[in-house]
Structure formats: structure tokens, C-alpha cells
């Protein structure tokens, strides 16, 4: 369970715009939980690694 997210990892949940998930793996999470991922990136909620603040993450390149 992500301490910043009210849902179980990989569980079904909805993340609001104020979601502070750092490692959000919720299948229904619609926002980008990764600062370098665009909102709507389908793979972002499955776990991604940011290469840098201004770079795209490994799963959204």
C-alpha cells in the first residue's frame, strides 16, 4: 500500500487530481503519478521509472 495513496497496490481505485501517489499502480488511475509522464499514459499506472525531471519516463518514451 502506497502511504500516499488510499488504495491497495494494483487494486481498483480512482485517483483524483489531488492524488499524491508516488508509486501508483492502481489499474484505474487516470492521472499521471509520475512528473515526467503525460496525463493519460496507460502504462504510467503500472509502474515507471523517471530518468530525469525533464525527461520522459521509461514506459512513456
Curated annotation (Swiss-Prot):
A divalent metal cation 5 binds at residues 34, 36-37, 50. GO terms for cellular component: cytoplasm; nucleus. PROSITE patterns: METALLOTHIONEIN_VRT (PS00203). A divalent metal cation 4 binds at residues 33-34, 44, 48. A divalent metal cation 3 binds at residues 15, 19, 24, 29. A divalent metal cation 7 binds at residues 50, 57, 59-60. Residues 30-61 are annotated as: Alpha. InterPro entries: Metalthion_dom_sf, Metalthion_dom_sf_vert, Metalthion_vert, Metalthion_vert_metal_BS. Keywords: Acetylation, Cadmium, Copper, Metal-binding, Metal-thiolate cluster, Zinc. A divalent metal cation 1 binds at residues 5, 7, 21, 24. The modification N-acetylmethionine is found at residue 1. A divalent metal cation 2 binds at residues 7, 13, 15, 26. A divalent metal cation 6 binds at residues 37, 41, 44, 60. Residues 1-29 are annotated as: Beta. Belongs to the metallothionein superfamily. Type 1 family. Class I metallothioneins contain 2 metal-binding domains: four divalent ions are chelated within cluster A of the alpha domain and are coordinated via cysteinyl thiolate bridges to 11 cysteine ligands. Cluster B, the corresponding region within the beta domain, can ligate three divalent ions to 9 cysteines. PANTHER family: METALLOTHIONEIN, METALLOTHIONEIN-1F. Monomer. This is Metallothionein-1E. It comes from Homo sapiens (Human).
